[in-house]
Amino acid sequence: MKSVDLKILDARMREYLPAYATPGSAGLDLRACTEASLVIEPGQTVLVPTGLAIHIGDPRYAAMILPRSGLGHKHGIVLGNLVGLIDSDYQGQLMVSTWNRGTQPFTLDPMERLAQLVIVPVQQVAFNVVEDFDASERGAGGFGSTGRG
């Protein structure tokens, strides 16, 4: 199994290193590496530092920053860009675009779990211009064409 070297930018993170919660966990929790609590007003989007830098270094892998379901469902706190994609050659600190889509201000405390990091395989593709496609059962149907009528 490929391991990814995560570099720590902030010494406070020693006590809060990301870890898989269970053997079946896909994501690692990312924390708000801030000096003080941050109030995010309804409709506001802020960039929150995580204190972690990542360099995957292998183009067969990428990382995705995903929301934590409880924050979105209970408090309206989601990712401002919905999903953060981290390319294998990126070497900077991970920042979380955090959007309060709720109706109440939300206080984000230092080291609070904010998002999840998932490492995923990547397949780069080559394009081939063709005259037509081989027929498939679905064809060009989209936008619910295989569900309710």
From Swiss-Prot:
Domain of life per record: Bacteria
Signal peptide limits: none
Residues the record lists as binding substrate: R68, S69, G70, N81, L85, I86, D87, M95
Catalytic activity annotation: dUTP + H2O = dUMP + diphosphate + H(+)
Enzyme class: hydrolase
Keyword Metal-binding among UniProt keywords: yes
Record field: transmembrane: none
Gene3D superfamilies listed in its UniProt record: 2.70.40.10
InterPro entries listed in its UniProt record: dUTPase, dUTPase-like, dUTPase-like_sf, dUTPase_trimeric
Cofactor(s) listed: Mg(2+)
Keywords: Hydrolase, Magnesium, Metal-binding, Nucleotide metabolism
Pathway: Pyrimidine metabolism; dUMP biosynthesis; dUMP from dCTP (dUTP route): step 2/2
Listed PANTHER family: DEOXYURIDINE 5'-TRIPHOSPHATE NUCLEOTIDOHYDROLASE
Sequence similarity: Belongs to the dUTPase family.
Protein name per UniProt: Deoxyuridine 5'-triphosphate nucleotidohydrolase
Source organism per UniProt: Bordetella pertussis (strain Tohama I / ATCC BAA-589 / NCTC 13251)
Lineage per the UniProt record: Bacteria, Pseudomonadati, Pseudomonadota, Betaproteobacteria, Burkholderiales
Gene field: dut
